[in-house]
Amino acid sequence: HFTYTTALISQASLFEAHERYLDLHIVLSGCEQVALAPVESLDEAEVRADEDSTMYRGTPEYSVTLDQNRFLLVFPGEGHLPKLSDSVPMNIDKLVLKIPC
């Protein structure tokens, strides 16, 4: 369970991707943008093997809007950059479930 304030897309930082888990993102309140790109199009920045997480730099191929009516399932090899807003920063209450694959 996470609570945070989104950042503007122009202030975006690192994408994250996993090898052993799917991420199920469920927004409980608020609205956020999640930028997405295949890891093959990104540059590796940092490996966090103990967290099954690799961080990447790069440009999003597309983004999706998450709110209480939409969820996002992110598969291994999909770079994702959550916690974004395209206009005004918003307060978000969200669950992220890690599903072994």
Regions found by a protein language model. Name each.
Residues 1-18, 28-43, 76:
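Conserved short histidine dyad/triad with adjacent acidic residue
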Residues 3-19, 49-60, 81:
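Short acidic (Asp/Glu) patches
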Residues 19-33, 38-40, 47-57, 98-99:
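Short, conserved beta-strand element in jelly-roll/cupin
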Residues 24, 71-73, 89-101:
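A short hydrophobic beta-strand segment most commonly corresponding to one strand
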Residues 24, 62-64:
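Short, surface-exposed secondary-structure edge patches
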Residues 36-38, 83-86:
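A short secondary-structure junction signal
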Residues 40-42, 80, 89:
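Short, surface-exposed beta-strand-loop junctions and turns on beta-sheet-rich folds
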Residues 65-84:
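Conserved metal-binding segment of the jelly-roll/cupin
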